[in-house]
Amino acid sequence: MTTSTAAKRTKSGCWTCRLRRKKCNEGGPPCDNCEARGIHCHGYGPRPQWKDRGALEREEARKLQYQSGRGRSYSRSSSTAAAAAPKPAEGAMVTGGSSSSSRGSGSSIYVGGNGLGGAQEEQHGDNNAPFSAGTGNFEYQANPAPGMSPLMSDINLALDAHAMDPLDFNIDFSSTPSSAVDKSSSTSADSPSFTSIECSQFPIFSPELPVDTPVALFPQVAPIPPGLPGRESVPVAACTDLVISHGLLLAEMDRPVGQRHGQVMAEGEKGIELMMRCPPAPRAPRLEGQGRSAHILLFVRDWYAASSWRIWSGNIQDCQNHIDAAASLLLEHETALVGEAHRLSNMERKALAFFTVRLIWNDVLLSSTRRTVPKAEMVYRRLLLADSNSRGGDSHTTTSTTGPTTTTPLLAASTFWDLTGCEGAVLLAMLDASILSAWRLGEEASGSLSIRALVGRADKIEAVVEGEIARLSSLLPRSPEKTSSASGKPSHGRKTGPENEVTVATVHSLIFAHAILTDLHQTVSGPRASVPEIGDSISRAISSAWNLWQEQQQQGAGLGLERILAWPYCVAASLAKGDQREVFREIIARTENGDGSSSGGDVQQLKSIVEQCWATSSSNHRDWKDVVQRSNQFGVFLI
C-alpha cells in the first residue's frame, strides 16, 4: 500500500468504534459513542498509521474492547485464514484463530452446524442491516443501541466480538442447516479475522478462560445430538452465562457508582432475563451419554452465575430462587451425573466440582442465616458425607428423617477442603445445625415445641462437632511449650510454615466447628451472651482457633476475614462479652490494616453487624441473623 493510499480516508465514521456514519474533518472531536463509554477514542481525522498493520490493528481493537456489527457483517474468517487453517478432526475441540491478546488467555466459542464447511465472509457496504445468526428458535442481532453496552441493545443478545470487559470473548455462531445462508468471500484489514472451522457433527464449545478467575471457569460442553429437546438452549445459556459473568466481573472489580452502576445493573438483569427464557434442561432419559451431563452442568453453572449476580445486586430472594433452581437440577439429575461422572472430561470434572461446591456452600450458609432447609438437602448430605469419608472424618449420625445417606463418587476426594478451605464434615454439621434451627422455628410457630426433643437433637449434633474438633486439633503440629489464652493474645509454640500445608485449612475448619457449637447453644438457649455454654464455647474458639488464625495472618498465610470466615466471625463475635469483644475488635482491625487483599466494604459490613448486636443489653441480646435479614447483608457470607 502506497503512502498516498494510506493517507487517504476510505471510510467514514469513528476510527475506533465505526458507528458514526458521516464525513469527518481532520482534528474533529471524539466520537460521542466512545466518549460515553469512557473509551480512548482515536477521533476523526486521517487514516491512523496503525490501520495499515493487520496484527497491530487487531491488537488495538481488542484493547478498545469494542467492534461494531453495523454497516457490515463480520465474518468467521478471511479467505486467507480459512485456506491456511487445518481441518480439525471429527468431534474435536477447536479454538479460534484470534491469537494475541492484551489480556492473556481469551475464549473462543463456536457452534457449528451439520456439514457446514467453509467460511462466512465479511461483506462491505453502506447497508445498515445488522448481522444475525439463527440458532434454532433464537435470533441474535449485533446492532447496539447508542449509549448502551453492545451486549445489552435489547432482549435479543447482541453478539459483539470484543465487547466483553475485562475478558475477551470471540463469539461466533454459525447458522443451523435450516437457516444457513451462503456468504460471499472477501477480506479486509479493518476487522479481526476468525479461523473458519468445518464441524460435521454438532454444537461444540471450547472455551479457554483464565482459570484463576472464578466466574470465568466455564465447562467444555460436549456435542448434543440434534432433534432432542433443549438443544436450542445450549447456545442461549452459553451467551447468557457470558453476559452475567461480564456484569458480575464489572461489579466486583470496578465497584461502579452512578451511571456506571446503572449500566452494570442493566447488563446483569438483561442476561438473567434472557436466561429465564431458555428452555429447561432436558430430563435424564431424553439425553444419553456425555452430552446429558455436560448439558446439565452448563445450566447449573448459569444458575450459579445468576445467583452470584443477585448476591451483588442485593436481591436475596431471587438469589435464593436461582440457587434452588440449580439445586433442583442436581436433585433431579443426580443419578445421571453420578453414573456418567467417569465420562466427563478433566475440565468438566473440575467445573462440576467448582460450581457444585460453591452452590452447596452458598446454600448452606444462606439457609443457616435465614433459618431454612436447603431444597436439595439430601444431595448435599450425600456429597458432604462422601467428602468427609474421603478425608477419614468421623462417621456422621445426623438428625435427618428423610432416609439413610449414601456416598457418591460425583466429586473428587477433598473437594470442599481444596475449594473452600473448610472440610465437608464440618459443613455437614453446619447443615444439621441449620435444619435444627429451622425445625425449632416451625415448632414454635405451631405451638408444639418440645424442649426435650430440641435438646436431644442438639446433643447428637454437638457430639459429632466435638469429635470433629478433637480430630482437627490433633492435626495441628504443636511444640512442647504449647500455650493458649482466651484473652486475645496469640499463643506461641505452634509450627506454622510452608512445611505444614494442612494447617491453614485445618484452622479454618476448626474455626467453623467452634462456631457451630456456639450456634447450637444459641438455637437451644436463644441469643443470650450470659448463657454459660455460649461464653465457654466462644472462649474455646478464641484460644484454640482464632489465635491460630491471627498467627497465620502475621505470617502472611491463610484467607482474609471476609466471605469465607464471615459466618463464624458473626456467630462468635455477636455473642462475645467483656475481654472477648476486644479479641474480635483486634481481628477486625488486623483485617482492615492488612495487605489490601480484603474487601473493605465486606469488613465494614461485618463490623456493623456485630456492633449492632453489642449495642443491646446482655439480658436482651440481639440475634445477628435478624440484623442481617433486616439490613439485607447476606452477600457478606456468600462466595
Curated annotation (Swiss-Prot):
Protein name stated in the entry: Transcription factor phomR'
The species this protein was found in: Diaporthe leptostromiformis
InterPro entries: Fun_TF (IPR021858), Zn2-C6_fun-type_DNA-bd_sf (IPR036864), Zn2Cys6_DnaBD (IPR001138)
Residue ranges: DNA binding: 14-41
Chain intervals with Low complexity compositional bias: 68-108
Chief subcellular location: nucleus
Keywords: DNA-binding, Metal-binding, Nucleus, Transcription, Transcription regulation, Virulence, Zinc
GO cellular component assignments: nucleus
Ranges for region Disordered: 58-136, 476-499
MF (Gene Ontology): DNA binding; DNA-binding transcription factor activity, RNA polymerase II-specific; zinc ion binding
Keyword Transcription regulation in annotation: yes
Short name of any one Pfam family annotated for the protein: Fungal_trans_2
Gene3D superfamilies according to UniProt: Zn(2)-C6 fungal-type DNA-binding domain
Family matches, as PANTHER family: PRO1A C6 ZINK-FINGER PROTEIN, TRANSCRIPTIONAL ACTIVATOR PROTEIN UGA3
Function: Transcription factor; part of the gene cluster that mediates the biosynthesis of the phomopsins, a group of hexapeptide mycotoxins which infects lupins and causes lupinosis disease in livestock. May play a role in the regulation of the production of phomopsins.
Subcellular location: Nucleus
